[in-house]
Amino acid sequence: MTVRVSFLIGCLGALTLPAALADNGRLIATGGASSIEGTAGGGLTPWAVLAGYGEQHEWGATAFATTVNLPDYRLDVAGVALAYDNRVELSFARQRFDLGSLVHKLNLPEDSLGQDVLGLKVRLFGDVVYDTLPQVSLGLEYKHQTDFEIPRLVGAKRDSDVEGYLAASRLFMGAAFGYNVLVNGSLRYSRANETGLLGFGGDRRDSRSLLKEGSLALLLNPRWAVGVEYREKPDNLSFAGESDWADVFVGYFPNKHVSFVLAYAHLGEIATLDHQNGSYLSVQGSF
């Protein structure tokens, strides 16, 4: 799978919703972007916000395409998300991870790994802007690794799993020299190897770990945002170390229907190859 503009346009055209589509509703950029697992949030981490800009009794929806180019690998992701009543979100993402030079280095039987991610997120309480409490959401993700031969060879125990996370998001108005600041923190309960692309559990550890994730975004104006993300990851496989992930990003939100995120992703060691740092680009359409 390669990321093509035509795919994104097709996804957007396929999203048919009732007449109560969100148009005004939440502040621009507070719907976030799309994470690599399909849910609303940052690129690497989910936020407590839901897809699109729908409020009470309104629908919201997004479709996105993301590509991450690294020295030895490439990750392509495409997906959609649908939310209703600013209460519940369903999402789906399909990932393809090209193994690049690792194929010849380790004489691998496949040249890529794939994963499908089906997500459910429910807002428990609060609001990212208008409540005294932060918006808090609970999420579940069912992940299925679709090319399990390589993960099995390196020690992964299973090709699918369910993981949960709890996220809290809050927009602080004028908090940084007059600029708005969005803060998100998440706890994930997971045993995924490289987010599931290398299966789940391993010869070193097969139980789930409680993992920290966070995002900080400075809204320079209603259309531009800059920020950082961090994602802690487990270390379940003995054949290679697994680095925590981080990025520095710039987001552009010209209106509520399209957004662009460009980032420098610091992903460290992936499957024995270190210094996997490179560019991240995501395009999202919203309703």
Q: Across the structure, where does each feature detected by a protein language model lie?
A:
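Repeat-unit-sized solenoid/scaffold elements
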Residues: 89-100, 164, 201-219, 247-265
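Transmembrane beta-barrel architecture of outer-membrane proteins
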Residues: 74-76, 96, 114-116, 162, ...
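Cleavable N-terminal export/targeting peptides
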Residues: 1-33
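Transmembrane beta-barrel domains of Gram-negative outer membranes and organellar outer membranes
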Residues: 22-148, 152, 159-164, 169-175, ...
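Small side chains
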Residues: 10-13, 139, 227, 285
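Detector for outer-membrane/organellar transmembrane beta-barrel domains
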Residues: 156-236, 244-245
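Predominantly the C-terminal beta-signal and adjacent terminal strand-loop region
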Residues: 240-287
